[in-house]
Structure formats: C-alpha cells, structure tokens
C-alpha cells in the first residue's frame, strides 16, 4: 500500500508540474498574413566579368507593414532588409535578412530566400518574386514565437514594390 501511495503522489506531483509549467509549451499555429509597401533606397550592382547579363546585387530596402485581425501585431512594423541577389538577365536567386521594429518596441530578425523572374512587358523588363521566410530571432513580444511562411512581390515603380505574405505564427516555441 505504501508503494502504491508513493507512486500515486509522485504521478500527481508530476502532473501538476506539467499543468502549471505549460507556459513554455508551444501553442497552436495561428494563420497570419499582411502586406508590405517597400522602397529600395540603396542598391549596388556588380557585373560578373566574362558572363554577360550576370550581376550580383546588394541592396537595402525599407518597408512598412500593414495587417489586421490575428495578424494585427505586425501592423505598422518598420522594416529594413539587407539583400543579395544573383541574377542572370534579371532572373535568379535572392536571399536576405530583415530587421523589423514593431509598435510595442519588440524586434524580429527574419531570414528569407526566393526566386526573381524578369520578363519583358511592352518592351520593358518587369520582375516578380516569390519565396519563403522564417523569423530567426526576436525580442519583447516576438522573443518566444516562431513565424514562417511564403511571400510574393511585384514592383509598383523603379524603386518601389509591394509584398504579400502569409504564414503561421506559433507562440512559446523558442
């Protein structure tokens, strides 16, 4: 009887610890999404010698996010992107990092990668891009969450573009 009582008490103690300690456990993924309006204030193109039409591009982009509903925490985010593109005749791979500053003072660093495709439309090159992203670090309310998903982008002018993004946000995963 003593052994059964000890095992029961131990199991109850462990069960209580698990219930009381759920703060660090991952929550259910929430669908999130929004739009970013972006500008490219700085861009440097380096031609790849001996390979006509091949350039490496290093650029900084600034964006303002808009979102609502479950995605409301992303609304008004101020972002700076640091990007490297490897393009042949305007098409190729892109990769970068984005630093977001949110209204509540939190920050997030996100890694992204994708592909850009450039086609001629009415005699002018026009690009579209798509890819994936994942938040790698965060502070404040963004410190203990995971955000990942997909994005698509298209230009609105020579130095501006819009990006739509969708994904999942899971709290308590880091």
Could you describe each region identified by the protein language model?
Residues 1-7:
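Positively charged n-region of N-terminal signal peptides that target proteins for export
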Residues 8-19:
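Bacterial N-terminal signal peptides
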Residues 24-174:
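Beta-strand-enriched cores of mature, soluble protein domains
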């Amino acid at each position: 009887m003593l052994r059964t009582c000890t095992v029961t008490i131990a199991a109850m103690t462990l069960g209580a610890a698990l219930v009381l300690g759920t703060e660090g456990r991952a929550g259910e993924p929430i669908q999130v999404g929004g739009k970013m309006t972006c500008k490219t204030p700085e861009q440097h193109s380096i031609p790849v010698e001996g390979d006509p039409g091949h350039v490496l591009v290093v650029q900084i982009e600034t964006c303002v996010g808009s979102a609502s509903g479950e995605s409301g925490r992303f609304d008004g985010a101020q972002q700076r992107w640091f990007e490297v593109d490897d393009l042949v005749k305007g098409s190729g791979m892109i990769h970068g990092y984005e630093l977001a500053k949110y209204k509540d003072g939190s920050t997030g660093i996100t890694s992204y990668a994708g592909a850009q495709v450039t086609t001629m439309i009415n005699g002018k090159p026009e690009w579209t891009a798509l890819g994936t992203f994942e938040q790698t670090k965060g502070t404040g309310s963004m410190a203990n969450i995971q955000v990942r998903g997909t994005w698509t982008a298209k230009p609105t002018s020579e130095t501006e573009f819009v990006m739509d993004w969708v994904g999942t946000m899971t709290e308590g995963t880091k």
